[in-house]
Regions:
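Short terminal interaction segments
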Residues: 1-13, 95-156
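Extended, charge-rich alpha-helical scaffolding segments
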Residues: 2-97
Protein backbone atom coordinates (compact mmCIF):
# COMPACT_ATOMS: atom_id res chain seq x y z
CA UNK A 1 0.00 0.00 0.00
CA UNK A 2 1.33 3.45 -0.85
CA UNK A 3 1.64 6.28 1.64
CA UNK A 4 -1.57 7.79 0.27
CA UNK A 5 -3.42 4.48 0.74
CA UNK A 6 -4.08 4.64 4.51
CA UNK A 7 -5.00 8.33 4.33
CA UNK A 8 -7.40 7.68 1.48
CA UNK A 9 -8.90 4.72 3.33
CA UNK A 10 -9.41 6.93 6.40
CA UNK A 11 -11.10 9.59 4.29
CA UNK A 12 -13.49 7.00 2.86
CA UNK A 13 -14.27 5.67 6.33
CA UNK A 14 -15.04 9.19 7.57
CA UNK A 15 -17.63 9.59 4.78
CA UNK A 16 -20.14 7.21 6.34
CA UNK A 17 -23.52 6.64 4.84
CA UNK A 18 -26.34 8.46 6.58
CA UNK A 19 -28.42 6.48 9.06
CA UNK A 20 -31.74 5.08 7.88
CA UNK A 21 -33.52 7.95 9.60
CA UNK A 22 -31.20 10.51 8.00
CA UNK A 23 -31.67 8.85 4.61
CA UNK A 24 -35.46 9.09 4.98
CA UNK A 25 -35.22 12.75 6.00
CA UNK A 26 -32.92 13.50 3.04
CA UNK A 27 -35.34 11.77 0.71
CA UNK A 28 -38.33 13.70 2.09
CA UNK A 29 -36.45 17.01 2.04
CA UNK A 30 -35.44 16.36 -1.57
CA UNK A 31 -39.05 15.82 -2.59
CA UNK A 32 -40.09 19.06 -0.88
CA UNK A 33 -37.23 20.91 -2.60
CA UNK A 34 -38.26 19.47 -5.96
CA UNK A 35 -41.84 20.63 -5.42
CA UNK A 36 -40.58 24.20 -5.14
CA UNK A 37 -38.08 23.73 -7.97
CA UNK A 38 -40.72 22.47 -10.39
CA UNK A 39 -42.92 25.47 -9.59
CA UNK A 40 -39.94 27.68 -10.43
CA UNK A 41 -39.22 25.66 -13.57
CA UNK A 42 -42.80 26.04 -14.73
CA UNK A 43 -42.53 29.81 -14.28
CA UNK A 44 -39.24 29.89 -16.21
CA UNK A 45 -40.74 27.84 -19.04
CA UNK A 46 -43.66 30.27 -19.29
CA UNK A 47 -41.17 33.16 -19.47
CA UNK A 48 -39.18 31.27 -22.09
CA UNK A 49 -42.27 30.85 -24.25
CA UNK A 50 -43.05 34.57 -24.03
CA UNK A 51 -39.46 35.46 -24.89
CA UNK A 52 -39.53 33.10 -27.87
CA UNK A 53 -42.80 34.58 -29.15
CA UNK A 54 -41.26 38.04 -28.89
CA UNK A 55 -37.91 36.91 -30.39
CA UNK A 56 -35.99 38.17 -27.33
CA UNK A 57 -32.65 36.46 -27.79
CA UNK A 58 -30.95 37.84 -24.67
CA UNK A 59 -33.87 36.83 -22.46
CA UNK A 60 -33.86 33.35 -24.04
CA UNK A 61 -30.17 32.95 -23.27
CA UNK A 62 -30.63 34.01 -19.63
CA UNK A 63 -33.63 31.74 -19.22
CA UNK A 64 -31.77 28.81 -20.76
CA UNK A 65 -28.98 29.27 -18.20
CA UNK A 66 -31.48 29.49 -15.33
CA UNK A 67 -33.36 26.40 -16.53
CA UNK A 68 -30.11 24.48 -16.96
CA UNK A 69 -28.91 25.32 -13.43
CA UNK A 70 -32.28 24.40 -11.94
CA UNK A 71 -32.44 21.10 -13.82
CA UNK A 72 -28.89 20.22 -12.70
CA UNK A 73 -29.87 20.78 -9.06
CA UNK A 74 -33.02 18.69 -9.49
CA UNK A 75 -31.02 15.90 -11.10
CA UNK A 76 -28.58 15.92 -8.18
CA UNK A 77 -31.53 15.57 -5.78
CA UNK A 78 -32.96 12.73 -7.88
CA UNK A 79 -29.64 10.89 -7.69
CA UNK A 80 -29.54 11.47 -3.93
CA UNK A 81 -33.17 10.30 -3.60
CA UNK A 82 -32.37 7.07 -5.42
CA UNK A 83 -29.28 6.52 -3.24
CA UNK A 84 -31.34 7.08 -0.10
CA UNK A 85 -34.06 4.71 -1.32
CA UNK A 86 -31.42 2.07 -2.12
CA UNK A 87 -29.98 2.49 1.37
CA UNK A 88 -33.44 2.11 2.90
CA UNK A 89 -34.69 -0.75 0.74
CA UNK A 90 -31.84 -2.33 -1.17
CA UNK A 91 -31.44 -2.57 -4.95
CA UNK A 92 -34.32 -1.59 -7.26
CA UNK A 93 -36.45 0.31 -4.72
CA UNK A 94 -39.77 1.90 -5.60
CA UNK A 95 -41.53 4.87 -4.09
CA UNK A 96 -44.39 2.57 -3.08
CA UNK A 97 -41.88 0.67 -0.94
CA UNK A 98 -40.63 3.96 0.55
CA UNK A 99 -44.23 4.94 1.35
CA UNK A 100 -44.74 1.61 3.11
CA UNK A 101 -41.95 2.46 5.57
CA UNK A 102 -43.94 5.37 6.98
CA UNK A 103 -46.79 5.50 9.47
CA UNK A 104 -50.26 6.10 7.95
CA UNK A 105 -50.48 9.88 8.37
CA UNK A 106 -47.01 10.77 7.05
CA UNK A 107 -47.47 8.11 4.34
CA UNK A 108 -50.67 9.76 3.11
CA UNK A 109 -48.98 13.19 3.07
CA UNK A 110 -45.97 11.86 1.15
CA UNK A 111 -48.12 10.02 -1.35
CA UNK A 112 -50.13 13.19 -1.99
CA UNK A 113 -46.96 15.24 -2.34
CA UNK A 114 -45.46 12.64 -4.68
CA UNK A 115 -48.56 12.72 -6.89
CA UNK A 116 -48.40 16.51 -7.02
CA UNK A 117 -44.71 16.31 -7.92
CA UNK A 118 -45.46 13.85 -10.71
CA UNK A 119 -48.12 16.25 -12.07
CA UNK A 120 -45.66 19.15 -11.97
CA UNK A 121 -43.08 17.05 -13.81
CA UNK A 122 -45.62 16.20 -16.53
CA UNK A 123 -46.68 19.83 -16.86
CA UNK A 124 -43.07 21.00 -17.16
CA UNK A 125 -42.41 18.34 -19.80
CA UNK A 126 -45.46 19.56 -21.72
CA UNK A 127 -44.30 23.18 -21.48
CA UNK A 128 -40.76 22.23 -22.47
CA UNK A 129 -42.04 20.40 -25.55
CA UNK A 130 -44.29 23.34 -26.45
CA UNK A 131 -41.31 25.70 -26.19
CA UNK A 132 -39.09 23.38 -28.18
CA UNK A 133 -41.69 23.02 -30.91
CA UNK A 134 -42.03 26.80 -31.15
CA UNK A 135 -38.27 27.36 -31.32
CA UNK A 136 -37.84 24.65 -33.96
CA UNK A 137 -40.65 26.14 -36.03
CA UNK A 138 -39.13 29.61 -35.76
CA UNK A 139 -35.72 28.24 -36.80
CA UNK A 140 -37.27 26.39 -39.76
CA UNK A 141 -39.06 29.51 -40.93
CA UNK A 142 -35.87 31.57 -40.66
CA UNK A 143 -33.96 28.96 -42.67
CA UNK A 144 -36.62 29.11 -45.40
CA UNK A 145 -36.51 32.89 -45.46
CA UNK A 146 -32.72 33.03 -45.57
CA UNK A 147 -32.03 30.10 -47.88
CA UNK A 148 -35.26 29.54 -49.79
CA UNK A 149 -37.20 26.34 -50.13
CA UNK A 150 -35.22 23.18 -50.86
CA UNK A 151 -37.93 21.91 -53.13
CA UNK A 152 -40.87 23.95 -54.33
CA UNK A 153 -42.81 21.09 -55.89
CA UNK A 154 -43.36 17.69 -54.34
CA UNK A 155 -42.98 14.77 -56.76
CA UNK A 156 -46.27 13.12 -57.70
Amino acid sequence: MTAAGPAAAGAVASQQQPSRQQAMHMLLDGIAADMAAYATLQHLLEQQFEAAVRHQRAALEQLAEAVSALVEAMEARRVQRVACAVQLLGPAPSMAQVFALLKPEPRARLQQQWQELEQRVLECKRLGKRNSDLLVEQYTIMQRVLHGEDQIYEPA
